[in-house]
Every structure is written in structure tokens, then in C-alpha cells.
């Protein structure tokens, strides 16, 4: 079972990496998010491949895909859908919005208002939408890939803590190195994106997600996760530590990373390598530190420093 899963995962990684040139670790994190039934927040400067990654992942799966461009005038109904009165039947009929897709690209999510941002909360957490006293289930698998520009860019609204906590991982792509950028200039990534065909079906994705949940986690590693999140709650550098949801996210992501590496069990390195992308966006840095440095980078550094102080299980 695990070897068959590994073959499917390798196929998916290879397909996506063709479009996102020179960023295999970023691709791996995106696949980890998918396997862990999580959502991905991709933050970076414009033009480094955030949207390309989302498109490549969606095109690699034989599932429905919708892109939502978040703007200042976007309304919750533009995302969730609306109930329309049918004159023939005398009843209201629900018309689903673009959120009712397997893979949803929420492009530049921090360019819309907090009210519209918060309309995603129920969908991301419970895989359902409640409107007009009715509950509508979302398709499975369901994954939101949200992109955002750094907050110093004009016209952005910071995501509230409740929204950030719904994202399994937050990643940055970064600039390509010289050789990879030359390949991009030659059109390598764009050509590959156009040619991408689905390599996994919806059933194969949900099977992989079920297999991920069966990856074994020793008791000592549960204690390790608890020690890490506990350290964030006690740190004098932070005003808000990691929630139980964050601890669960780190555990699920670690199980997915183990499966991606071809293992049926989690090792401490899985947890260590995912602690920053799984936890840093969930903490709040004290205001005096935010003034001294960018709060996002500072949060990464604080979580990493706390990690170094915690004994690793043997």
C-alpha cells in the first residue's frame, strides 16, 4: 500500500516541478498540504511563481478547479454563491459560487476586506457552507491555495488570526537562482504548465489522504509536538502561542512528509522541518519586536529558536 502511494506521489511531484522550475522543496510542501487535507498560504513578492504553483497542482489532478481573484470590492456571495428566486416554482434555488470546487485558488487573498476573507472560515474548517438556513457540502478532496503579497505592498489587508489558523502551512517561494532563472527566460516553466495533464484522479487523492492518516506516530513524538507548541505559549517574545489546531496541523503535516519520503512512520526530523511553515503564521510577535523587524520573519526566527531548545526524542 505504501509503495503504491509513493509511486503516485512521485508522479505528482514530478508533474508540478516541471512548471515551477528549481523549487522542488516548495513543490514538496504543496504536496504535503494536499495529503494532510490542509490548505496552503503562499506569501511572496509578485512574479515568483505563486499562481503558477497553484495552477500546476490543480492541473495535475483530475478534479474541478476555480480561481478567485480577490479584490477590494469582492463580496462573500461572489465566493459562496447566492439563492435565486425561481418564479416558476415559487422557491429559492441555490446557485453555488466558485468555492464549490475541489481545488480553489484564492489569488491575492489579502487584497479584499476582512469580511470577505472571513467568509472562507467555515468552508476551510468544516468542508461545508451554510447559507439561508441550509448547509451545502463541498466536494472531496477540497483544498484552498491562497496567495498573498507581503503586507508592505500597497492595498493589502492582513489576514485575521482566525483565518491564518485555518492554513496548514505557510510557505515562501523566493527568487530562482541564476541557472533556473535562465531556464525560465527560455520559457521552460510556461511551456510545461501548458502541457500538464492530470496524473491523479479524485479517488487516488482521497486514498492518499486516507493512507496519510495511517502513518504511525510514536508516543514520544506526540510529546515532542506538545513540547514545541507549549514553548510558543510560554515565550515572552510572543503574545499568542500555537493553538491545539496548530498542534494537530503539525502532526498531520509530519505524517504526510513521512509518506512523501516513503516511510510508514514519523521521525523527529519530519516535525523539525515542518515546525516553522506549520506554526510561525499562527503566533503573534510582541509589538516592540514587530517595530524592530518584519513580524513575519521575526516569527519564523522565534519558532526556530524555540525548536533548538527542545530536546529531540531518541
Feature names for model-found ranges:
Residues 60-88:
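AAA+/P-loop NTPase substrate/partner-engagement loops
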Residues 31-71:
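Walker A/P-loop
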Residues 2-3, 234-314:
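C-terminal engagement/docking regions of AAA+ P-loop ATPases
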Residues 44, 107-108, 119:
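Walker B catalytic acidic pair
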Residues 29-32, 85-105, 134:
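Conserved alpha-helical scaffold flanking the Walker A/P-loop in AAA+ ATPase domains
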Amino acid at each position: 500500500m505504501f509503495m503504491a502511494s509513493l509511486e503516485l506521489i512521485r508522479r505528482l511531484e514530478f508533474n508540478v516541478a516541471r512548471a515551477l522550475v528549481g523549487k522542488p522543496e516548495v513543490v514538496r510542501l504543496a504536496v504535503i498540504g494536499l495529503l494532510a487535507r490542509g490548505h496552503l498560504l503562499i506569501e511572496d513578492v509578485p512574479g515568483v511563481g505563486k499562481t503558477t504553483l497553484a495552477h500546476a497542482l490543480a492541473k495535475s489532478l483530475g478534479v474541478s478547479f476555480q480561481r478567485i481573484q480577490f479584490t477590494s470590492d469582492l463580496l462573500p456571495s461572489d465566493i459562496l454563491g447566492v439563492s435565486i428566486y425561481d418564479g416558476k416554482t415559487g422557491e429559492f434555488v441555490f446557485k453555488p459560487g466558485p468555492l464549490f470546487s475541489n481545488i480553489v485558488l484564492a489569488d491575492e487573498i489579502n487584497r479584499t476586506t476582512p469580511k470577505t476573507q472571513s467568509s472562507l472560515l467555515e468552508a476551510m474548517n468544516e468542508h461545508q457552507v451554510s447559507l439561508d438556513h441550509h448547509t451545502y457540502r463541498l466536494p472531496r478532496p477540497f483544498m484552498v491555495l491562497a496567495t498573498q503579497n507581503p503586507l508592505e505592498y500597497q492595498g493589502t489587508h492582513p489576514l485575521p488570526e482566525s483565518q491564518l489558523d485555518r492554513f496548514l502551512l505557510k510557505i515562501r517561494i523566493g527568487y530562482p537562482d541564476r541557472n533556473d532563472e535562465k531556464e525560465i527566460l527560455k520559457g521552460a516553466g510556461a511551456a510545461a504548465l501548458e502541457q500538464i495533464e492530470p496524473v491523479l484522479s479524485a479517488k487516488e487523492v482521497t486514498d492518499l489522504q486516507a493512507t496519510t492518516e495511517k502513518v504511525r506516530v510514536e508516543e514520544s513524538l506526540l510529546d515532542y509536538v506538545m513540547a514545541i507548541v507549549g514553548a510558543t505559549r510560554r515565550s515572552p517574545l510572543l503574545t499568542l502561542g500555537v493553538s491545539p489546531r496548530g498542534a494537530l496541523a503539525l502532526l498531520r503535516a509530519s505524517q504526510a512528509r513521512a509518506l512523501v519520503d516513503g516511510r510508514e512512520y514519523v521521525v523527529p526530523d519530519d516535525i523539525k522541518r515542518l515546525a516553522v511553515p506549520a506554526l510561525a503564521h499562527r503566533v503573534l510577535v510582541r509589538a516592540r519586536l514587530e517595530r524592530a523587524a518584519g513580524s513575519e520573519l521575526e516569527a519564523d526566527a522565534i519558532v526556530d529558536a524555540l525548536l533548538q531548545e527542545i530536546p529531540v526524542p531518541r
